[in-house]
């Protein structure tokens, strides 16, 4: 099963990932070493920026990144969850979901489906049918 690695400032992202049911959930600042593919869930800071802690983590481990999801607040308009756009563009990975604050049950369902899809797609690339 895939690792979900998250970054959370106010607790919204942590509450979201805890609702997903995934077994391997770790926080960015608790990771000493990463050697398996992962999905990143982060927040958006300031005016649509990627948090420095997330960026620092990705500088080391982006080669294992399968996809990204981000939290935000819709009052920020075009900057809502914009960190996902930046990470997706910078590291050429799909945006799995954008959710407001700590997300709804529908957000959790959509995110879980997208994680399963990207993991299946990634596994097929790593283990092609002979």
Curated annotation (Swiss-Prot):
Q: Which GO terms describe its molecular function?
A: FMN binding
- Factors inducing expression: Part of the probable nrdI(ymaA)-nrdE-nrdF-ymaB operon. Expression is constitutive but low, dramatically induced by thymidine starvation which requires recA.
Report the InterPro entries cross-referenced here: Flavoprotein-like_sf, RNR_Ib_NrdI_bac, RNR_NrdI
The species this protein belongs to is Bacillus subtilis (strain 168)
Query: Organism classification, top ranks?
Result: Bacteria, Bacillati, Bacillota, Bacilli, Bacillales
Protein role: Probably involved in ribonucleotide reductase function.
Q: Which domain of life is it from?
A: Bacteria
Describe the family membership recorded for this protein in Swiss-Prot or TrEMBL: Belongs to the NrdI family.
User: What's the protein called, per UniProt?
Assistant: Protein NrdI
Q: Which GO terms describe its biological process?
A: protein modification process
